[in-house]
């Protein structure tokens, strides 16, 4: 008989940024354990709150099904000797099965006859195995730093206080993480019943909400926060900034979400909104309120914020006033730092960068600034941006690191540089570049908006990549300098803006600016290989298959925009009817040429062409070579591959009718030359022999 199953683990406060991950992993792990144990069920739903992880399994079978286990033994021909006596192999197999050889059955297949043992295995009751399954699911959670507590030897992400396991209304007895299962559920610390018993799995989570004032359904809590926050913002004429990561964190911090609106003095709005938002979101987990949506030029920060309380107070005004008192000193600090910092122009802080170390072997932030300045000017020249403005932006790029605001609110680096540069009267492109130098900050982030910003952003990232590789600290598992993200940022900028830039030139220029600081003689090669490797993850995320990416990577094109054109062309080619046949032919040609140990002529000898099929292919290759020159010259690889698809018929005919490895050496070499020329046409774009069916 199928019943609902509940397991709830009551803990001390779980890390809010990990709560969803833990709950989803618990559900996935437990479902995998149920599948492995062959326990029928109709789905697993997870619940998570700050002090609990729980699962409910719908219609969980009360026992495993009975089954017949078959164990095949040796072939009959090997199981008996010439006199018909069991061999040692047969006897050993039979002993392992707990039978004698003459008790074994026979299994006949098209490959012969085998000894067979069949055993009926009774299914175990769910109550006897589910505790072990749950323990395994919890043991395999992604916990980086488990902890011990009290005098226990068990480890978990936080101390475990309660354990409840119910199968319908039956208590499943057992112990996990040193805690015995019982019917006790803990409620909210300050509301409802702090402790009560639960009679059946079906009561969960409703009983916890009704009696314990804890909303265990994570998604329901999140939905309430989103809906009520937007309503609260609309009530003050604004729109709430409900960044998903912050919403997730707040959802993980509260058991009973109560959304409230507070305000602060309008005089603080004279401070750049980024600094105010940083302290509201980062320090206090508040949601700022804006006048308009993102992207609207009229968007302004309003003197309100929304927060989520974990208690339903009879006097919410006191809760609101308390939060206003907490945030006010932080906003006052931001105001003070802003006013103080503006008393000195950014450029005056440049010498102070000598006191800040970028990396011991690579020098100070001032050294990095000098390199960025030079490299930004070089890149600006290549992409047609203003060279002098790019150099000026490079010079000022890191100066805001020496301001009080950025020292106190580190996430405002860049954006505060922009505001201070505007105050100093710097050109707008220069000021904007100080903020956009860090773009793109993450996958899918916006790119720098102008040429000056682009030059500085690329220069900063390339300097870091080349420098760290240059001292032999390429990322392996961890990536403390975020070189993967920096590499992808450079590639995205080049590809999406279509710049005709070559990584070989960029890396060489960046390397030259380090003087004798670098110790890795292969730094240029290493950096280019690393950056090209980032393409694999990027294009996979874009939906391109691995074999398409590998086909292009095999040619190692070092111009990112050119790489992009090749990937898209090969993807288009793969959908053509001729693609599979030509990919197979290219693979065959590659294998044939790999086995030939010798030199081939650059051109075929027309006089040695004998078969009609090889003459036709030779003519097609010659015509195609000339026809494709304009497409190759302009990088129109899609057009080139579409034309190359026309070679399917003469290629198929060649392999059907021509013996490549002829006895006549001259004839064989001529045919190999023809195939080599054919393959080289495709290799000018990609190695399509790597395409899979």
Curated annotation (Swiss-Prot):
<keyword id="KW-0648">Protein biosynthesis</keyword>
<dbReference type="GO" id="GO:0006420">
    <property type="term" value="P:arginyl-tRNA aminoacylation"/>
</dbReference>
<dbReference type="GO" id="GO:0004820">
    <property type="term" value="F:glycine-tRNA ligase activity"/>
</dbReference>
<comment type="similarity">
    <text>Belongs to the class-II aminoacyl-tRNA synthetase family.</text>
</comment>
<dbReference type="InterPro" id="IPR006194">
    <property type="entry name" value="Gly-tRNA-synth_heterodimer"/>
</dbReference>
<dbReference type="InterPro" id="IPR015944">
    <property type="entry name" value="Gly-tRNA-synth_bsu"/>
</dbReference>
<keyword id="KW-0963">Cytoplasm</keyword>
<protein>
    <recommendedName>
        <fullName>Glycine--tRNA ligase beta subunit</fullName>
        <ecNumber>6.1.1.14</ecNumber>
    </recommendedName>
</protein>
<comment type="subunit">
    <text>Tetramer of two alpha and two beta subunits.</text>
</comment>
<dbReference type="InterPro" id="IPR008909">
    <property type="entry name" value="DALR_anticod-bd"/>
</dbReference>
<dbReference type="GO" id="GO:0004814">
    <property type="term" value="F:arginine-tRNA ligase activity"/>
</dbReference>
<dbReference type="GO" id="GO:0006426">
    <property type="term" value="P:glycyl-tRNA aminoacylation"/>
</dbReference>
<keyword id="KW-0067">ATP-binding</keyword>
<dbReference type="GO" id="GO:0005524">
    <property type="term" value="F:ATP binding"/>
</dbReference>
<dbReference type="GO" id="GO:0005829">
    <property type="term" value="C:cytosol"/>
</dbReference>
<keyword id="KW-0547">Nucleotide-binding</keyword>
<keyword id="KW-0030">Aminoacyl-tRNA synthetase</keyword>
<keyword id="KW-0436">Ligase</keyword>
<dbReference type="Pfam" id="PF05746">
    <property type="entry name" value="DALR_1"/>
</dbReference>
<dbReference type="Pfam" id="PF02092">
    <property type="entry name" value="tRNA_synt_2f"/>
</dbReference>
């Amino acid at each position: 008989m199928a019943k609902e199953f509940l397991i709830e683990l009551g803990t001390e406060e779980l890390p809010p940024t990990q709560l969803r991950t833990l709950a989803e992993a618990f559900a996935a792990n437990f479902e995998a354990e149920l599948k492995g144990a062959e326990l029928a069920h109709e789905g697993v739903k997870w619940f998570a709150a700050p002090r609990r992880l729980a699962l409910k399994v719908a219609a969980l079978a009360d026992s495993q099904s009975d089954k017949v286990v078959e164990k095949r033994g040796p072939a009959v021909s090997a199981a008996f000797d010439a006199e018909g006596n069991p061999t040692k192999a047969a006897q050993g197999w039979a002993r392992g099965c707990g039978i004698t050889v003459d008790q074994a059955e026979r299994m006949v297949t098209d490959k012969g006859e085998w000894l067979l043992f069949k055993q009926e295995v009774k299914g175990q009751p769910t109550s006897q195995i589910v505790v072990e399954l749950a323990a395994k699911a919890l043991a395999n959670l992604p916990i980086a730093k488990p902890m011990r507590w009290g005098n226990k030897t068990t480890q978990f992400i936080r101390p475990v206080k309660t354990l409840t396991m119910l199968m319908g209304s039956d208590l499943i007895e057992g112990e996990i993480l040193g805690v015995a299962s019982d019917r006790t559920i803990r409620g909210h610390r300050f509301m409802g019943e702090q402790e009560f018993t639960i009679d059946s799995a079906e009561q969960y989570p409703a009983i916890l909400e009704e009696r314990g004032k804890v909303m265990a359904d994570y998604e329901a809590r999140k939905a309430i926060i989103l809906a009520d926050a937007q309503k609260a913002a609309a009530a003050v004429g604004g729109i709430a900034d409900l960044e998903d990561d912050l919403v997730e964190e707040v959802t993980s911090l509260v058991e009973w979400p109560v959304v409230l609106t507070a305000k602060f003095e309008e005089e603080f709005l004279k401070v750049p909104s980024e600094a105010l938002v940083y302290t509201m979101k980062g320090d206090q987990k508040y949601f700022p309120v804006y006048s308009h949506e993102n992207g609207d030029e009229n968007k302004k920060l309003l003197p309100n914020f929304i927060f989520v309380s974990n208690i339903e107070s009879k006097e919410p005004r006191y809760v609101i006033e308390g939060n206003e008192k907490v945030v006010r000193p932080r906003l006052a600090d931001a105001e003070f730092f802003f006013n103080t910092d503006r008393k000195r122009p950014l450029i005056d802080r440049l010498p102070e960068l000598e006191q800040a170390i970028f990396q011991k072997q690579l020098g100070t932030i001032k050294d990095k600034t000098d390199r960025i300045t030079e490299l930004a000017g070089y890149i600006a020249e290549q992409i047609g941006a203003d060279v002098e403005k790019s150099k000026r932006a490079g010079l000022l790029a890191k100066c805001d690191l020496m301001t009080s605001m950025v020292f106190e609110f580190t996430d405002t680096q860049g954006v505060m540089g922009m505001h201070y540069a505007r105050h100093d009267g710097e050109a707008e492109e220069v000021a904007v570049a100080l903020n956009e130098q860090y773009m793109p900050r993450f996958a899918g982030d916006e790119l720098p908006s102008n040429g000056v910003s682009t030059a500085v952003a690329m220069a900063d990232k390339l300097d870091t990549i080349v420098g760290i590789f240059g001292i032999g600290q390429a990322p392996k598992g961890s990536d403390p300098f975020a070189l993967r993200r920096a590499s992808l940022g450079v590639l995205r900028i080049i590809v999406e803006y279509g710049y005709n830039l070559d990584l070989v030139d960029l890396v060489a220029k960046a390397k030259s600016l380090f003087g004798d600081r670098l110790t890795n003689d292969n730094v240029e090669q290493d950096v280019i290989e690393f950056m090209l490797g980032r393409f694999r993850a990027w294009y996979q995320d874009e939906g391109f298959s691995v074999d398409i990416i590998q086909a292009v990577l095999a040619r190692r094109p070092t111009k990112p925009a050119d790489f992009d054109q090749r990937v898209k062309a090969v993807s288009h080619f793969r959908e053509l009817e001729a693609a599979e046949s030509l990919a197979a032919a290219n693979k065959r040609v590659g294998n044939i040429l790999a086995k030939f140990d010798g030199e081939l002529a650059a051109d075929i000898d027309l006089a040695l062409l004998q078969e009609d099929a090889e003459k036709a292919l030779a003519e097609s290759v010659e015509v195609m070579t000339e026809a494709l020159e304009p497409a190759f010259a302009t990088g129109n690889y899609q057009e080139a591959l579409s034309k190359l698809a026309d070679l399917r018929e003469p290629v198929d005919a060649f392999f059907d009718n021509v013996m490549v490895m002829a006895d006549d050496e001259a004839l064989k070499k001529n045919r190999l030359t023809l195939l080599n020329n054919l393959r080289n046409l495709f290799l000018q774009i990609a190695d399509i022999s790597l395409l899979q069916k």
